[in-house]
Structures are given as structure tokens and as C-alpha cells.
């Protein structure tokens, strides 16, 4: 057959690799990453496109390049006379910068790319996205007391700096989306005051997908995290979800007689560096989850640290050289490390590490009523481990991954609430455990180690020695599939 033979018969048509190109959810006025599709000629005849155009011209914000030709204003957002020989193909590139829509929820943005053959036959590919109006902040410096409280998402470029005499308050329900170069540096005070129903969310700004099954929001290293400098004190992160950072929370060395950070009912998840790193600081962690970090979930180098009713789960999926759930050393001097009613676990056989100090430096620490994936202490330091459950790494029925409701390594989805098989159930001390868990569920007379109090599904009543009669609440998801969100 002559590949140079072109037909004008309407019996022949092109084949598209998709009939609808979805560009995920995007922030209005912010360019999307480029997506592509292919146009194939499998008809047996050569075909000419007399016209390719955007149906709405420049009204939707889509930008299209067809086989190297940009459909811009000079060409009237169209092109013509494109040959697609038999068994050949052309590639189409699509981007979107959507205009503001004035709405508080994502709005559908849609256009059709129309392909008209010489025969007059018209074919189309639908271009579709959801556009979300956002407030854009660039290199924000807080020099006086300021509250950020927005119904719309806030996208941060370049970062936020809180001056030494200023307090930045993040109101409940606030969502901050950080670009890759952005984070928060605190010289003064940061107060993130989320609630159980409306947490503050700090995350990266990419709403698209790396793969169809994997949103970038589940990929670590998307932004730069929070740094509390030496002059910063009295910081509060309450009901705050911090995820997909590089280093999440760093505390510089400072006066340990003043509390530097109180982390309460919060989540730190999926970090390409460490989760929390405290260098000779006063740190309190309560009812919180720190999980899946390339570095240590929690690392303490001296200072004064109190940990209660918290979960440290080291299941970082992107690198087998992940560190531990907890590392501590005396650093320049340790006042105390006191861990109570908490769960330390992960993939490795030992996820709790410490560096023995020089004889001149004390290392006062203690673990009470904790579940720990580490070797049982047999030295004189065993007196520092009181009512501790040591995980047996060979036991795969109730330790490690078996503690938790969902460890989905294929789709990188995690729910660190307790499963009914967990050895953390009833392992805490009723006298010192927090009265409610990270979700606001009341702890019973035999409380559980970690941030989550086990909730038995209704079908499984009675459970946990007939003492726990709670309906399972909806799981807190650490990530939102933006395609599902936008569909609502």
C-alpha cells in the first residue's frame, strides 16, 4: 500500500490515545505540569487535518502544542494542514493556567480540542481539569502578631519567616501548600491551633500525580518543613498535619528552662529527611504520630524531652537505608528523656538507638509502659525500662506492621490506628496516659500505647476483653486524592 496516498473519504479516521485528558486539580493562575497524548493513523490511508483548534479559543486557559505547532493567539488558537501518514502518529502537549473563578471550592475547567479532517469528519479530545482559587504568598515575613485564617488554600513560595518579636497563629482549618523551595523559619513564635474536626494542614503544592495510582502528595521531599531557631520559644503545633516534607521539624539548641515546642494531637508523616530533630531543647510530644521518615522519626540530642501516648512508626517506603523510630544521645548535655505509654516500631529488628555518652556527660532517660521494637535491656540500664513490652521481631502476628489498620505498600497509603491484633492494646498506664486519643476518642480503664486508642468495629463487639465498645470512626487519611476530592 502507498503510504503517501491521502484520502478525503469520511470512512477513514484517526485514533486517539485518550478521549479525555485529565490534568488533575490545579490552583488558578498557577501553570500545570505538561501532559501529553498521541494521535495515531491506523486507517490504512494517509490523512490530512485541515484544522486543529481549541473550541473555546483562549477562554479556558489551556495551552496546546500539536506536532510542534503552538496553538497561540497569533494563529487564532488553531493550526491547519497537518499530515498524518498511514501507520504514523503525532504527539499533542497540553498545559493549563486557569483564571480565577471566584469560588471557594474547585471548579470544572473544560475545553475540546477539535480535529477536522479534509473529509469534513470532526473528532475531539476533551481537556478537563479542576481549578481551585488560592491565595498566593511569596517570601512572607511576619514582623508583628499575625493570624492566618483562610477558607481558601494558601500557596507559599519562597517561605515564611517569623521575626523574633512576632507570633504567627495558624487558625483551625487552614491549609498551607508549600512550593518545593518553601518552608517556615521561626525566630519568634508559631502557634498552629487546629482542632480534631478542622486540623491545620501543611503540605506540598503539587496536586497532580506521579503515576495514576500515586499522587505527589504521597511522595516525600515536597517542601522544606519547619525550623525553630535558638530564639524561638512557646511554640504550639496542635491538631496539625505535617506531611511529605524533607526535614519536618528542627529545633535549634536553646534554653531548656523554657518550653520550645509542644506537639499535641498532630501527625508528622512521610519525610525525606528526619521527622523531629531536637538539639538541646525543651520538647513535649503528646498524642502524636511521627511516621515514615528516611532519617529518624524522632532524634533527641540532649535537652529536656517528654513523650506521652505517641506513636513512632518507621515504615519509610522509598529507601531501604531508612533510620530508626527513635535515636537519642546526650549531645551537649541531657536533662531528661521521659517516654511513657508510647509505641516505637518499624521494619527493622531494632528501631530504638542511642549513643552512650562520655563518662563526664549524663544520659538520664526512662521508658515506662511503652511497646518497643528493640533488644531487651540486660545491663544496669534495665531499671530505666519499666513495664516495657519488647517486640519479638520474629513474631509477625501482633508486632511491626500488624499493629496497624492499614500498611498499603503498593499504593503508599497508611492508617496507623491500631488493629485488633496489636500488642499495644491495654499496654499503657491508666494513671499517666492521656484521657483521650489523637482523634478525641476517650481512653478506657486499660488504655493503649500510642496515639490511637483501639476502636472495635461494630460487627466485632465485644472486643478487647469485652471492655471496648466503640463504633469505628472514619479513618483519618493523611492524603487526599485530589481527583476524588474535586469530583465532589
How does the language model describe each region?
Residues 1-20, 42-95, 100:
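Surface-exposed binding patches on compact interaction domains or structured appendages
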Residues 13-25, 30-31, 36, 75-414, ...:
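Beta-strand/loop edge motif enriched in small/polar residues
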Residues 42, 438, 482:
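Short, ordered coil/turn segments that flank beta-strands lining enzyme active or ligand-binding pockets
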Residues 135-143, 463-469, 473-474:
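Disulfide-bonded cysteine-rich modules in secreted/extracellular proteins
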Residues 442, 447-467:
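A recurrent domain-boundary module in secreted/ectodomain proteins
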Residues 469-488:
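C-terminal outer-membrane/trafficking sorting elements
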Amino acid at each position: 500500500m502507498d503510504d503517501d496516498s491521502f484520502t478525503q473519504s469520511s470512512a477513514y479516521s484517526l485514533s486517539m490515545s485518550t478521549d479525555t485528558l485529565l490534568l488533575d486539580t490545579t490552583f488558578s493562575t498557577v501553570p500545570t505540569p505538561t501532559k501529553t497524548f498521541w494521535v495515531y493513523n491506523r486507517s490504512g490511508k494517509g490523512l490530512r487535518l485541515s484544522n486543529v483548534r481549541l473550541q473555546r479559543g483562549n477562554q479556558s486557559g489551556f495551552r496546546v502544542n500539536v506536532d510542534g505547532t503552538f496553538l497561540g493567539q497569533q494563529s487564532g488558537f488553531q493550526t491547519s494542514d497537518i499530515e498524518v501518514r498511514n501507520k504514523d502518529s503525532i504527539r499533542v502537549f497540553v498545559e493549563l493556567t486557569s483564571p480565577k473563578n471566584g469560588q471557594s471550592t474547585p471548579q470544572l475547567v473544560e475545553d475540546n480540542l477539535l480535529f477536522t479532517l479534509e473529509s469534513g469528519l470532526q473528532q475531539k479530545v476533551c481537556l478537563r481539569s479542576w481549578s481551585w482559587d488560592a491565595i498566593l504568598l511569596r517570601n512572607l515575613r511576619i514582623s508583628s502578631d499575625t493570624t492566618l485564617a483562610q477558607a481558601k488554600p494558601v500557596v507559599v513560595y519562597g517561605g515564611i519567616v517569623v521575626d523574633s518579636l512576632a507570633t504567627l497563629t495558624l487558625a483551625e482549618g487552614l491549609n498551607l501548600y508549600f512550593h518545593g523551595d518553601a518552608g517556615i523559619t521561626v525566630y519568634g513564635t508559631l502557634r498552629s491551633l487546629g482542632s480534631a474536626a478542622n486540623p491545620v494542614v501543611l503540605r506540598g503544592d503539587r496536586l497532580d500525580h506521579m503515576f495514576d495510582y500515586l499522587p505527589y502528595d504521597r511522595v516525600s521531599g515536597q517542601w522544606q518543613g519547619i525550623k525553630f531557631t535558638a530564639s524561638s520559644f512557646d511554640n504550639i503545633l496542635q491538631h496539625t498535619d505535617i506531611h511529605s516534607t524533607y526535614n519536618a521539624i528542627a529545633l535549634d539548641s536553646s534554653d531548656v528552662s523554657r518550653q520550645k515546642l509542644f506537639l499535641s494531637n498532630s501527625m508528622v508523616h512521610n519525610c525525606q529527611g528526619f521527622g523531629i530533630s531536637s538539639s538541646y531543647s525543651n520538647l513535649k510530644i503528646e498524642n502524636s504520630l511521627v511516621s515514615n521518615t528516611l532519617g529518624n522519626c524522632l532524634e533527641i540530642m540532649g535537652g529536656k524531652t517528654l513523650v506521652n501516648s505517641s506513636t513512632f512508626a518507621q515504615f519509610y517506603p522509598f529507601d531501604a537505608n531508612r533510620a530508626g523510630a527513635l535515636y537519642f544521645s546526650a549531645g551537649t548535655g541531657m536533662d531528661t528523656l521521659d517516654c511513657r505509654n508510647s509505641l516505637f516500631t518499624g521494619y527493622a529488628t531494632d528501631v530504638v538507638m542511642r549513643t552512650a555518652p562520655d563518662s563526664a556527660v549524663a544520659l538520664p532517660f526512662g521508658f515506662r509502659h511503652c511497646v518497643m521494637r528493640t533488644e531487651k535491656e540486660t545491663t544496669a540500664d534495665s531499671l530505666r525500662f519499666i513495664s516495657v513490652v519488647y517486640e519479638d521481631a520474629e513474631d509477625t502476628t501482633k508486632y511491626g506492621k500488624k499493629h496497624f489498620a492499614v500498611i498499603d505498600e503498593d499504593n503508599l497509603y497508611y492508617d496507623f490506628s491500631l488493629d485488633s491484633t496489636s500488642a499495644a492494646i491495654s499496654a499503657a498506664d491508666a494513671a499517666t496516659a492521656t484521657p483521650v486519643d489523637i482523634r478525641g476518642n476517650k481512653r478506657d480503664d486499660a488504655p493503649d500505647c500510642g496515639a490511637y486508642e483501639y476502636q472495635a468495629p461494630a460487627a466485632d463487639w465485644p472486643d478487647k476483653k469485652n471492655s471496648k465498645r466503640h463504633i469505628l470512626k472514619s479513618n483519618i487519611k493523611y492524603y487526599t486524592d485530589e481527583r476524588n476530592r474535586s469530583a465532589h
